[in-house]
Each structure stands twice: as C-alpha cells, then as structure tokens.
Amino acid sequence: MRIDVISLFPEFIKQSVGFGVIGRAQERGLLDLHNWNPRDYAQGNYRRVDDRPFGGGPGMVMLIEPLRACLEAVRAADPQPAPLIYLSPQGVLLNQSRARKLAMLPRMILLCGRYEGIDERFIAHEVNMELSIGDYVLSGGELGAAVVVDAVTRLQEGVLNDAESAKQDSFEAADSLFDYPHYTHPSNHAFGNVPEVLRSGNHVAITRWRRQQSLLRTWLRRPDLIDEARLSKADRLLLDEIKRTHPMDTDRKASASWRGA
C-alpha cells in the first residue's frame, strides 16, 4: 500500500511510524510511505504557507497555492488514483470498520492541517474525505495521520507475523467486542497469579473463559457496544450471568451514554 502524507512537519511523521510493526512493514516493502512538505512548493524568499484570515480573528490560515502545487507533485509522482483525506476534528470518526475500508485502498493521500486550518476553498475543491481521530483538538493533523497510517498498515496482508493476532484485537472481531485479558510467564507473581483455567490445557474451557472475559470487559467498559454486537445464544447466556453479577450502575450508564453521543 502507498500512503502519501502532506505535512509542514514531515519529520514528525517519519519518527512516529518508523518503529515496531509499521517500521518493519516499510523495510519489507509492505508500506510505501512518502512525506511531502507544502513549504517546498511555496513561492518567494520566505516560502510562506499561511496568511491572516479574512474577516479578522486569531491565528493564520494555510494558503491554497502551496497546497495545490504540493498536491500536483504528489499526484504526478504516481499515476494511481488516490483519495485526499484531510485530518480534521470536523471529519467522520475513525473506527475499526472505517480503518478496514481504508486498508482496502491501494493508495491514499493524507493532508495535515496547521494553525487555524486550511483555506476552505481548497477543502471544497480537492478534499475527498475529512477524517477525525476523536472529539478533541490537536495542534495539527500529524498525530492523526500517524494513527491512520498505523491502523491501516497493520491490516495489510503479511504485516503482522500472526494474522490471528489482528483478528482477535479489540473491535476487530465480527462482533466488535473488547479483547480478553492476556498473561505470560511467570504464572505466579506478587501482582497476582495466572487464572487456573489458562494453565489447565482444556481448550474448550479456555475458549469459554476468554469469551466470557471479552463480554465482561465490554459490558463493564463500553456497554453501548453490546447493543451493536452479534451475539450467539451461548453468548447471551454468558451475558445474562454477567449482568446478574455485575449490574450496571448509574455512573456507567451516564458514561456509556456520553461515549455514544
């Protein structure tokens, strides 16, 4: 997959996704990442990329022309069509379902804003999607772009050594429940012991325990996801047991309502 990132701080992107799984994906040619700086396409001695907003107000707004020239260079570098995705708190929210859809694209271009934002005319004329990573404001789009690169790249075939690892992640299963707890050696520790069922060798019991824990975690932390999950009859029996032993209190109801807003 090829991802082009347009940013005034390309080094930020390089550093953010240069390690671990995503770094190895680049080394192995599974992710073809290119960074572009609009300042390189700005005119004049000062290579200005921003100006004051019409109508007054605080801050600066990114200019159309450096962005337009930069985007032309990005598109000329590879004839393969690609959507331009602008990282913005006003965009649609990135979730695992949307990450899977983006991962199916052969190429995408991510645009990072700075200052007060980008001239609206450029957005209206060139941007195909505005994408948000959450309901909060950051100093720029670079962190959001790094999140998108990570979320999308790890879904590419061959990136993870164990494909089952991705399938079992929170939000990744077909029912979108949280992942179950994980343990490793030693089995006994001052912080606690590994649950006996995981050491029993009884794979049926282990599978049931993991499913129960997945349901329990989702019920306790994000009960709103339970309503969206596709649960089997056995799941619903487990969930009924969980609800009896872990009734939802008022605070968690309010929290679930707030998260779903």
Curated annotation (Swiss-Prot):
Keywords: Cytoplasm, Methyltransferase, S-adenosyl-L-methionine, Transferase, tRNA processing. It comes from the Bacteria. It holds the Pfam family tRNA_m1G_MT. Its EC number is 2.1.1.228. It catalyses: guanosine(37) in tRNA + S-adenosyl-L-methionine = N(1)-methylguanosine(37) in tRNA + S-adenosyl-L-homocysteine + H(+). One of its GO terms (molecular function) is tRNA (guanine(37)-N1)-methyltransferase activity. It is an enzyme of class 2 (transferase). It is found in: Cytoplasm. GO terms for cellular component: cytosol. GO terms for biological process: tRNA N1-guanine methylation. InterPro entries: Alpha/beta_knot_MTases, tRNA_m1G_MeTrfase_C_sf, tRNA_m1G_MeTrfase_TrmD, tRNA_m1G_MTases_N, tRNA_MeTrfase_TRMD/TRM10. Its main location: cytoplasm. S-adenosyl-L-methionine binds at residues 113, 133-138. Specifically methylates guanosine-37 in various tRNAs. Homodimer. Belongs to the RNA methyltransferase TrmD family. This is tRNA (guanine-N(1)-)-methyltransferase. The lineage of its organism: Bacteria, Pseudomonadati, Pseudomonadota, Gammaproteobacteria, Lysobacterales. The gene is trmD.
